[in-house]
Amino acid sequence: MTQQYPLLDKINSPADLRRLPRTQLPELCAEIRQFLLTSVSQSSGHLASGLGTVELTVALHYVYHTPEDKLVWDVGHQAYPHKILTGRKQRLHSIRQKDGLHPFPWREESEYDVLSVGHSSTSISAALGMAVAAQRQSLRQKVVSIIGDGAMTAGMAFEAMNHAGDIKPDMLVVLNDNDMSISENVGALNHHFARLLSGRFYTSLREGSKKLLSPLPHIRHFASRAEEHMKGMMAPGTIFEELGFNYIGPIDGHDVDTLVDTLSNMRSLGGPQLLHIVTQKGKGYRPAERDPIGYHGVPKFDPKESSLPEKAPGIPSYSEIFGQWLCDTASNDKSLMAITPAMREGSGMVTFSQQYPQQYFDVAIAEQHSVTYAAGLAISGLKPVVAIYSTFLQRGYDQLIHDVALQNLDVLFAIDRAGIVGADGPTHQGAFDLSYLRCIPNMVVMAPSNEQECLDMLTTGYQYKGPAAVRYPRGAGVGLELRKGKVIDIGKAQTLTEGQNIAFLNFGTLLPEVEAAAAKFNATVVDMRFIKPLDTACLDQLMTTHSVLVTVEENVIAGGAGGAVSEYVAQHKASPQVLTIGLPDEFIKHGSQGEVRAELGLDAAGIERQVNDFIKKS
């Protein structure tokens, strides 16, 4: 590092931070913000969220005695400043890269990362467990959950708060509100009010009054209503108070001095506390302030430019192809209802949301609700399409079984980010969907090998009377000239190459790698297309003409498509040996998609190597 960061250079841990005089904290915040911008612009990563939490992160580590006190970050997009202050600034340039820093807080990486995260809305539940454990073990540690306003749209967050309000452990929830919808409430009066409400005099008076008035419920109720009326004039915290939390705020999340004062007061309070801060996503970098969504996750870019580099024209992504299919289908069918749990941009639905706003529903981070909401639409004669990432559909699994499949409802699941997603790592890999879908009765499960097949399968699933799923990967297809999607026969595979002895059964978009490997063995190649139902007629023929069946999928081997083939062969006491190639029984680390596939033996060379090893052992 250079003289550009004179204060930050001195900080290798929060203990170093706590040795700084308070007067230098604003200067340190400016250095962290500049360091974050410079580092991420050179390496890519999540930017806007971290820019918005610099002052909060500094104040938390300044007031709380980390790592003894526990900071529990939700999701982790906002935790880059936390990594910088906890001894990882020299490696920040490696974040999200193979063998580099993990993209989110990760327990194996640092003692300051007390909860590994990636999915949203988990922090309050985990922090509550830690707070209860601390009380049971008579520990003096404090526990803080830091959660964004987006994550607060998930029911799990309120389930945890409801429980915390009931059992009342000592804990703090910091609500980082960067939507700016209540920015007019942030000012000098509220700074004074926050200090007042978090101070010992007010809280002692408040708790003492409760005890004094407890035998007099009518008077206590009147006093409570009067208190809420006073606070409600300036603080929109009634819902949190009803859940049993003492609510403080909203305060300016970029005023580090006010944050330190307020957090210092709140650290000494007992029971569940909630501090509501207002921040600006992308704070301090004007392009990110103007376009916080665009600067949420960024490629390498020049900070001196006023915009991110334009994406070079090329082969459309599967997400873009899905979005165009939605628009084309909705143009002729007003019954189509598209649903996403807060993944409009990532799922390719921006244009659809603009052209068909009455047929578009962003239900926020509420995967369970999105699935059952789709069930209700289907019951009423509409045709819902749930666009969801593979890793997030896991969160709506019971609803998929109980509310959709059990009732055999017409719901299409467009499952994006299936297989290896790359830089976001183990919390986001779409590794399990084939396994958890194929065991559900009534489901039709499809995996296209290219973008044209994806269009055909979306059309097929949409027309199908019952629940259907199409899973496709992150990234672009192979560059086919696309025609309109057409309905294909359910459960029918396609034989692409006739060979001898060995048959490769491909499930999904690894087909080019499979074909390259199969050519080395003069093998048959079959694009299976359907995981459920399997093309059993095709399997019957292959079992009589080939001695080795090789299944290839970008899903865990356990319970996946290869398992379905192995089960069928075993049930029929057939002679072919079955080699299943897919993801191993482990959580897949971060790195580029190509790097991860090569490391796991899912490129052409790796597939060829695994087949050769299998034949040698046979």
Curated annotation (Swiss-Prot):
Q: Which HAMAP family match?
A: DXP_synth
Please name the InterPro entries in this protein's record.
Dxylulose-5-P_synthase, THDP-binding, Transketo_C/PFOR_II, Transketolase-like_Pyr-bd, Transketolase_BS, Transketolase_C, Transketolase_CS
User: How is this protein named in the record?
Assistant: 1-deoxy-D-xylulose-5-phosphate synthase
Give Gene Ontology CC terms: cytosol
Q: Which family does it belong to?
A: Belongs to the transketolase family. DXPS subfamily.
Describe its partners and assembly state: Homodimer.
The note on cofactor binding and number reads:
Binds 1 Mg(2+) ion per subunit.
**Which Pfam families does the record associate with it?**
DXP_synthase_N, Transket_pyr, Transketolase_C
The Enzyme Commission number assigned here is 2.2.1.7
Against CDD domains, the record matches this protein to: TPP_DXS, TPP_PYR_DXS_TK_like
User: Which annotated residues bind Mg(2+)?
Assistant: 149, 178
For binding thiamine diphosphate, which residues are annotated in this chain's numbering? 77, 118-120, 150-151, 178, 285, 367
Q: In which pathway does it act?
A: Metabolic intermediate biosynthesis; 1-deoxy-D-xylulose 5-phosphate biosynthesis; 1-deoxy-D-xylulose 5-phosphate from D-glyceraldehyde 3-phosphate and pyruvate: step 1/1
- The gene designation is dxs
Catalyzed chemical reaction(s) = D-glyceraldehyde 3-phosphate + pyruvate + H(+) = 1-deoxy-D-xylulose 5-phosphate + CO2
| GO MF term (any one) | 1-deoxy-D-xylulose-5-phosphate synthase activity
Please list the cofactors this protein needs. Answer: Mg(2+); thiamine diphosphate
What organism is the protein native to?
Answer: Idiomarina loihiensis (strain ATCC BAA-735 / DSM 15497 / L2-TR)
**SUPFAM superfamilies given for it?**
Thiamin diphosphate-binding fold (THDP-binding), TK C-terminal domain-like
**Protein keywords:** Isoprene biosynthesis, Magnesium, Metal-binding, Thiamine biosynthesis, Thiamine pyrophosphate, Transferase
Q: Per its database record, what is this protein's job? A: Catalyzes the acyloin condensation reaction between C atoms 2 and 3 of pyruvate and glyceraldehyde 3-phosphate to yield 1-deoxy-D-xylulose-5-phosphate (DXP).
